């Protein structure tokens, strides 16, 4: 969103100097320096920093002679919600034979929700392994084929099969596609009726170490304020380390290394683990207008 605003601001400078209408790099850099300064406090929605940002953008629009597009305003109000998660200390996983283990937060797993509620979670949700959690018809790929994940917790590998195999003929090889993104995987799991999804973290495939999702999960989540959120947002989203995922699958009698390798082959089918997981997340919820 800020990139679009910066582009608009730079174009304003072009309009203001119509004798040389080329896109001015110096103006773009100037606006970046201003908006990224400490004075704008991070520009988060619903904060004083956002108000300063909006005032600056509006000032630049007026200086360029642009006409307001929404009545006498340049701005459109958007209802948003800020959700600050406070996850339980552990996810409790139990097998069919009574074998249990704990996957602890934040060293093994991190979770959050975009449901604007004081608390949510899963209880005795069946754990399902879904390969990369991808449905990509143009690549002839469907990790959910024949797999019922309704009301269940899905485990899915980060990135896509092309990266794992380095095969340029599989997806786009080393270059990650949209299907490799974690937010896509959450959306796909939701479309299939899952209660939650944990992305299995691997530093090279993700492009960043575990510290990134671990630290990110302790920060507020911002989302549009929507109706029918239970149908439009997972109860739980999050990440799990490779080691923790391996322990869960091992408790189910499954070999994670073998599963991971098989997941990159065309025609792979996910599987139910027979394990059941419980975990909850408590939230501080604040509604705002951005």
Regions found by a protein language model. Give the residues of each.
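Long, well-ordered, tryptophan-enriched scaffold segments
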Residues: 191-204, 208, 214-289
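Hydrophobic alpha-helical scaffolding
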Residues: 21, 43, 47, 175, ...
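Noncatalytic luminal/extracellular "stalk/propeptide" segments of secretory-pathway proteins
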Residues: 41-168, 273-276, 280-290
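Extracellular/luminal Protease-associated
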Residues: 24, 104-236
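NTP/phosphate- and nucleic-acid-binding module
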Residues: 20, 180-181, 277-279
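N-terminal hydrophobic or amphipathic helices/low-complexity stretches enriched
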Residues: 16-69, 244-245, 251
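Bacterial N-terminal signal peptides
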Residues: 3-14
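Active-site-adjacent bridging/hinge elements
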Residues: 28-32, 163-165, 265-271
């Amino acid at each position: 969103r800020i990139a679009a605003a910066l582009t608009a601001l730079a174009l304003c400078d072009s309009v203001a100097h119509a004798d040389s209408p080329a896109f001015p790099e110096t103006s773009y850099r100037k606006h970046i320096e201003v908006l990224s300064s400490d004075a704008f406090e991070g520009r988060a929605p619903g904060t004083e920093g956002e108000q300063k940002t909006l005032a600056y953008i509006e000032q630049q629009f007026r200086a360029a002679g642009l006409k307001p597009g929404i009545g006498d305003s340049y701005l459109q109000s958007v209802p948003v919600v800020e959700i600050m998660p406070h996850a339980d200390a552990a996810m409790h996983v139990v097998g069919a034979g009574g074998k249990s283990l704990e996957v602890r937060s934040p060293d093994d797993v991190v979770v959050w929700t975009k449901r604007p509620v004081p608390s949510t979670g899963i209880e005795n949700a069946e754990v399902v392994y879904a390969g990369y959690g991808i449905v990509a018809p143009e690549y002839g790929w469907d990790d959910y084929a024949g797999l019922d994940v309704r009301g269940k917790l899905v485990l899915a590998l980060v990135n896509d099969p092309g990266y794992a195999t380095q095969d340029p003929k599989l997806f786009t090889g080393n270059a990650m596609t949209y299907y490799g993104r974690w937010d896509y995987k959450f959306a796909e799991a939701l479309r299939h009726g899952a209660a939650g999804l944990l992305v299995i973290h691997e530093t090279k495939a993700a492009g960043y170490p575990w510290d990134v999702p671990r630290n990110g999960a302790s920060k507020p989540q911002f989302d549009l304020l929507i109706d029918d959120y239970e149908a439009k947002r997972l109860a739980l989203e999050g990440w799990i380390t490779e080691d923790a995922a391996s322990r869960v699958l091992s408790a189910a009698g499954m070999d994670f290394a073998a599963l991971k390798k098989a997941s990159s082959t065309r025609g792979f089918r996910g599987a139910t683990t027979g394990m059941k997981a419980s975990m909850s997340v408590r939230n501080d919820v604040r509604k705002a207008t951005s």
